[in-house]
């Protein structure tokens, strides 16, 4: 399924997408598969492969203004059965708001929202059904539950997370943003992954840091969050955050088209109070536009392919070297045999050639 910044959802089957073994292949325009309104600034913000539309799993969505919403995957079954290029509304957005991310959740996962002002909000999505939940009041203005940003223990199953709602409903507040700040990244993490989990945060001026997820304290939904990136005067605004597996890679892409790929392990794991380190040196007037993670299994597969190709090259080089050595040995034998018989090397070669022809 494909989600756009305008809150629309599209669906297609994977076997309809073009395949290529060439990493430099351009592929086909996304408009060939989905009716994206490019002229109106519509872009894809999430692309999720789904095998089954399980009623116990959810699409958890986040918007630029810090609002969140979750809807059961089963609510999209009828839409998927139609399987055409038309779209449906996945979320009703407020004016000037955009959908920035969609993830699949279990209903009891941890949610992280990262804002461009260096703040991050961590809360549990678990929601305990109440008697009044039969009415559809999913607009953010009707759900301004404020949370405390004070340090302290939070019960993840207190039930004040994100209530499942219908496709036609609005959103509720996930993080209370300061000034003109906006959310740039959404992460959904299983509780079992929090203790050892890490994330990578990047800023517009090429700085970043790797941070333990456990260092971002859990709060109730709707709070202002905590600082995860300081010194924005030097670093620039936060442009994104991704899961930072130890053996994974990441890519940074700039406005001027520069791209680097590096290993997560090469970025120091530091505290959330630290300002961060240089990830990429920028040209004057350039800025980091996007951060993309490359999962550990993809990195491993890429390394295996690269190693296999290198082995093939080495084996081919060894065969060529062996053939050259064999040819050189044959030439040496001819050169040695000619004087012994009182013949020139050319005569020996001609005699050998005539013998071969006969």
How should each PLM-predicted stretch be described?
Residues 1-358:
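Short, structured "edge-of-domain" segments at secondary-structure transitions
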């Amino acid at each position: 399924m494909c989600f756009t910044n305008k809150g629309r959802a599209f669906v297609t089957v994977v076997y309809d997408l073009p395949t290529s073994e060439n990493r430099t292949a351009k592929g086909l325009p996304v408009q060939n598969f989905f009716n994206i309104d490019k002229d109106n600034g519509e872009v894809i913000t999430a692309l999720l492969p789904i095998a089954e539309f399980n009623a116990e799993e959810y699409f958890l969505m986040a918007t630029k203004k810090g609002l969140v919403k979750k809807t059961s995957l089963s609510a999209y079954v009828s839409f998927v059965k139609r399987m055409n290029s038309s779209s449906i509304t996945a979320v009703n957005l407020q004016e000037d708001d955009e959908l920035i991310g969609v993830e699949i959740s279990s209903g009891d996962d941890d949610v992280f929202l990262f804002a461009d002002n260096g703040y991050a909000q961590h809360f549990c999505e678990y929601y305990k059904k109440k008697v009044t939940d039969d009415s559809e009041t999913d607009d953010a203005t009707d759900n301004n539950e404020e949370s405390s940003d004070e340090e302290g223990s939070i019960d993840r199953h207190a039930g004040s997370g994100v209530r499942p709602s219908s496709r036609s409903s609005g959103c509720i507040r996930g993080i209370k943003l300061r000034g003109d700040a906006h959310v740039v990244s959404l992460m959904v993490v299983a509780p079992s992954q929090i203790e050892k989990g890490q994330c990578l945060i990047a800023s517009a001026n090429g700085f970043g840091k790797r941070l333990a997820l456990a260092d971002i304290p859990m709060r109730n939904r709707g709070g202002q969050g905590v600082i995860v990136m300081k010194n924005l005067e030097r670093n620039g605004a936060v442009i994104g955050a991704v899961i930072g597996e130890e053996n994974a890679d990441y890519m940074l892409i700039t406005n001027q088209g520069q791209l680097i790929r590096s290993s997560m392990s090469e970025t120091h794991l530091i505290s959330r109070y630290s300002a961060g380190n240089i990830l990429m040196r920028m040209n004057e007037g350039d800025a980091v536009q996007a951060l993309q993670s490359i999962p550990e299994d993809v990195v491993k597969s890429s390394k295996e392919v690269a190693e296999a190709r290198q082995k093939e090259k080495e084996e081919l080089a060894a065969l060529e070297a062996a053939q050259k050595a064999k040819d050189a040995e044959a030439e040496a034998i001819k050169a040695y045999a000619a004087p012994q018989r009182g013949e020139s090397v050319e005569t020996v070669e001609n005699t050998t050639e005539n013998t071969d022809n006969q």
